[in-house]
């Protein structure tokens, strides 16, 4: 690769899953030939050994940093913290469970270079044949309904905004994330909405994905997220993303 990369991992009580995730990412980065690569683990107020596990991995990969949020502030807060601190020219945020294999970063990079985009959105919905392990019937269909309402509320064209695998050109990321208001799960829709509002080209890219047991988001809590696209629209009307 000809550009440098920061990989941001928001983590809350990920002591058990994080070691394997970091091993896979470190191995990938060593194979990739990046001129500079860093891993940023953003601890969101974990009460287990997440921070210790991440710091131990620094012995194997010195360009690994651990950022700590002031308490459990939410996934959106954690991703913003990492994006505003990263040093690479590109910045990927990936869920700590690696439900999308880290190798799919190559796919996002190719899409950005091919289409001249500043944001690449990993998508489960564009090609569902790439899903190895599906979510439950209930969760998958809740996701479809959410997407329809999200598109109605925001005008965004994407078929999947909630896949935790997105790549940003770092200068664009700083402009987007400094305007972000949502600290919880609704931040994905918000940052894509802000990017589109700023005129940044965003491309949706099909990626491999597998449902990994151990989600910290209940289906009913996810239902509350149906309000988020409407809050984004309301914030836009009020001029809060200027």
Question: What residue ranges belong to the model's regions?
Answer:
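Cell-envelope/extracellular polymer assembly enzymes that use nucleotide-activated donors
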Residues: 4-6, 38, 190
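Donor nucleotide-sugar binding loop of glycosyltransferases
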Residues: 14-17, 46, 75, 101
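Short, well-formed alpha-helical segments that are part of the catalytic scaffolds
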Residues: 14-30
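Conserved donor nucleotide-binding strand/loop of the catalytic core
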Residues: 37-40, 51-85
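A conserved acidic beta->alpha catalytic loop
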Residues: 43-52, 98
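Acceptor/aglycone-binding surface of glycosyltransferases and processive sugar-polymer synthases
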Residues: 69-85, 90, 102-185, 210-227, ...
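Short active-site alpha-helical segment characteristic of glycosyltransferases
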Residues: 187-194
